[in-house]
Curated annotation (Swiss-Prot):
Highest rank taxon of the organism: Bacteria
PROSITE patterns in the record: TOPRIM
UniProt cofactor note: Binds 1 zinc ion per monomer. Binds two Mg(2+) per subunit.
Transmembrane segments: none
Disulfide bond sites: none
Protein name: DNA primase
Gene Ontology cellular-component terms listed: cytoplasm; DNA-directed RNA polymerase complex; primosome complex
Residues that, per the record, bind Mg(2+) 1: 249, 293
Organism: Aquifex aeolicus (strain VF5)
Subunit composition and interactions: Monomer. Interacts with DnaB.
PANTHER family: DNA PRIMASE
Domain Toprim as annotated: residue spans: 243-324
Function per UniProt: RNA polymerase that catalyzes the synthesis of short RNA molecules used as primers for DNA polymerase during DNA replication.
SMART domains: TOPRIM (SM00493), ZnF_CHCC (SM00400)
C-alpha cells in the first residue's frame, strides 16, 4: 500500500520544484546546472524528468524532489514534504506515514552523512583509492565513512529520525545513554533495493585489528540480507543493455569492475548466494556469468551458486580465473580487456560439460546429471540429455534418472541450536575440530559439508535461516558442544578401563 508521501512524489514534478530554486538548462532529455551543495564551476548537477530524481556527479548528492527541498531549505525531510504539499495544494497527514517510510528516510539521511564524512576523512578516502575505485564510481555508489557515533546521533535527532533509525538495528543499544554506530570507523557501502532506496549498509574495516573484516546491517523490517543483491539498482540498465549479468563474490570486486567500465555486475551481500537472490536476479536476466575467485573457496562457492541459478531458470556460464587470482588481481596483471575476453570465451555450463565429458566420462556424467536435476523445464532437460546421449551413448534412462540433488530434499528435522551451529559454520567460517564436538552422525555430515563450502548439500532451512547476534549464539552453542564432547570422551575412556 502506498503512503501519502508516495502519492505526493507522484503528483509533483521534480523539474518544476527545482526550477523554483535553480536555473536549469535542458540537455537532451535531462536538465543540468551548477550544484548548490558544493563549489561547482562546471555544471555537474543533473535532473531526470523520467526518473524524477536529481544527482550531482561532483559531490554525489541525489534523491527526489522532497529531498532536494529538505537539503536546500535545511529542514527535515518531513518538513519539506509538508512544505511541498502546502505549496501544491495537496493533502498530507504525517500521522499516516508508515513506519517503513520513516525508516527509508532515516537510512537515506544516514547515507548522506556517511558520504559527506568520506570526503572529509583522508585515511578512508585513501583506502578507497588504494582499492582501485574510480572517484566517479565511489560517488555513484554513495560510498561513505562512519566517523563518530555522536555525530551520527546528532544528525538523526536534528531530523527527528532517531527512533525510525533504531528500527534498522544499525545503532547498538546505548551504554550509559550513549549509542554506538555499528559501522564506526569503517568505509561504508550503501545497499539499495531495485528501486534505489537505501535499505542497509556493508562496512569494511580500514585498520588491521581483531574485528571482522566486513560487517553488514542486521536483518530488519526493510532489509533482508538473503533477499537482495548489491549493485542491482546501479547495474540493471547495463544488464538489460548487455543481455547478461556477471555475478561476483563481494562489494569491492563489483566496485573494481565498475571502475574498469564493466558495469553489468551484481554481488551477494557478503555471504553465499541464496535462492531468493537467484530468483531476484532472474527477473532481470536469464543469462549469468559467475566470476568468483580462482581459489578453492571460490570454486566451492561457484559450485553452490550454480544449482540456485539453474533452479531460477537462468543459463549459467562459469568463468574460471587462473589459480590464486581474484578479479582485481587479474585486471592488475593482465588488463581489463583480457578479463572481457575471458568472460566472453566462457561457455554455457551444459555446453561445456558435453564438450569436455570425454576427459573423464564417469565423473562428468554424474556432474551433468546432478546439474540437470535442477532444470525445471522438462523440454530443455530432455533436449540436453539427448545431446549428451548422442555424443557419449550414455543411456537416456540413466541421464534422466532423478538423483539426490542435495540435502534440501531430505526430511531433516533440525533443532534451533543445530540450525544456528550450521549457519555459524557457513557465515563465520571458524577453524574448529569436529572430532572434539558432541555431534550426531547426521549433524556431523552436514557440518563437514558446511566447512567444505558444499552449501548446496545443506538443508534449505539452514541456508535461508536469519538470526540476529549469530556470532554470540554460535560461540555459546560451540562451547556447549565442546563440553559435552569432553564428557562423552571421558565416559568412553572409563568404559574402556572397566
Amino acid at each position: 500500500m502506498s503512503s501519502d508521501i508516495d502519492e505526493l512524489r507522484r503528483e509533483i514534478d521534480i523539474v518544476d520544484v527545482i526550477s523554483e530554486y535553480l536555473n536549469l538548462e535542458k540537455v537532451g532529455s535531462n536538465y543540468r546546472t551548477n550544484c548548490p551543495f558544493h563549489p561547482d564551476d562546471t555544471p555537474s548537477f543533473y535532473v531526470s524528468p523520467s526518473k524524477q530524481i536529481f544527482k550531482c556527479f561532483g559531490c554525489g548528492v541525489g534523491g527526489d524532489a522532497i529531498k532536494f527541498v529538505s537539503l536546500y531549505e535545511d529542514i527535515s525531510y518531513f518538513e519539506a514534504a509538508l512544505e511541498l504539499a502546502k505549496r501544491y495544494g495537496k493533502k498530507l497527514d504525517l500521522e499516516k506515514i508508515s513506519k517503513d517510510e520513516k525508516v527509508y528516510v532515516a537510512l537515506d539521511r544516514v547515507c548522506d552523512f556517511y558520504r559527506e564524512s568520506l570526503l572529509k576523512n583522508r585515511e578512508a578516502s585513501e583506502y578507497v583509492k588504494s582499492r582501485g575505485i574510480d572517484p566517479k564510481v565511489a560517488r555513484k555508489f554513495d560510498l561513505g565513512y562512519a566517523p563518530s557515533s555522536e555525530a551520527l546521533v546528532k544528525v538523526l535527532k536534528e531530523n527527528d529520525l532517531l527512533e525510525a533509525y533504531l528500527e534498522t538495528k544499525n545503532l547498538l543499544s546505548p551504554t550509559k545513554g550513549v549509542y554506538r554506530d555499528l559501522f564506526l570507523r569503517r568505509v561504508v557501502i550503501p545497499i539499495k533495493d531495485p528501486r534505489g532506496r537505501v535499505i542497509g549498509f556493508g562496512g569494511r574495516r580500514i585498520v588491521e585489528d581483531k574485528s571482522p573484516k566486513y560487517i553488514n546491517s542486521p536483518d530488519s523490517r526493510v532489509f533482508k540480507k538473503g533477499e537482495n543483491l548489491f549493485g542491482l539498482y546501479e547495474a540493471k540498465e547495463y544488464i538489460k543493455e548487455e543481455g547478461f549479468a556477471i555475478l561476483v563474490e563481494g562489494y569491492f570486486d563489483l566496485l573494481r569492475l565498475f571502475s574498469e567500465g564493466i558495469r553489468n555486475v551484481v554481488a551477494p551481500l557478503g555471504t553465499a548466494l541464496t535462492q531468493n537472490q537467484a530468483n531476484l536476479l532472474s527477473k532481470f536476466t536469464k543469462k549469468v556469468y559467475i566470476l568468483y575467485d580462482g581459489d578453492d573457496a571460490g570454486r566451492k562457492a561457484m559450485k553452490s551458486a550454480i544449482p540456485l541459478l539453474l533452479s531460477a531458470g537462468v543459463e549459467v556460464y562459469p568463468v574460471y580465473l587462473p589459480e590464486g587470482y581474484d578479479p582485481d588481481e587479474f585486471i592488475k596483471e593482465f588488463g581489463k580487456e583480457e578479463l572481457r575476453r575471458l568472460i566472453n570465451s566462457s561457455g554455457e555450463l551444459f555446453e561445456t560439460l558435453i564438450k569436455t565429458a570425454r576427459e573423464n566420462l564417469e565423473e562428468k556424467t554424474r556432474e551433468f546429471r546432478y546439474y540437470l536435476g535442477f532444470i525445471s523445464d522438462g523440454v530443455r532437460r530432455f533436449a540436453l540429455a539427448s545431446e549428451f546421449h548422442t555424443k557419449y551413448k550414455v543411456p537416456m534412462e540413466i541421464l534422466l534418472m532423478k538423483i539426490e540433488k542435495n540435502s534440501q530434499e531430505k526430511e531433516i528435522k533440525l533443532s534451533f541450536k543445530e540450525k544456528i551451529f550450521l549457519k555459524g559454520l557457513i557465515e563465520l567460517k571458524p577453524k574448529i575440530d569436529l572430532e572434539v564436538l558432541n555431534l550426531s552422525p547426521e549433524l556431523k555430515e552436514l557440518a563437514v559439508n558446511a566447512l567444505n563450502g558444499e552449501e548446496h548439500l545443506l538443508p534449505k532451512e539452514v541456508l535461508e535461516y536469519q538470526v540476529d547476534n549469530l556470532e554470540k549464539l554460535f560461540n555459546n552453542i560451540l562451547r556447549d558442544l565442546q563440553k559435552s564432547g569432553k564428557k562423552r570422551k571421558k565416559r568412553g575412556l572409563k568404559n574402556v578401563n572397566t
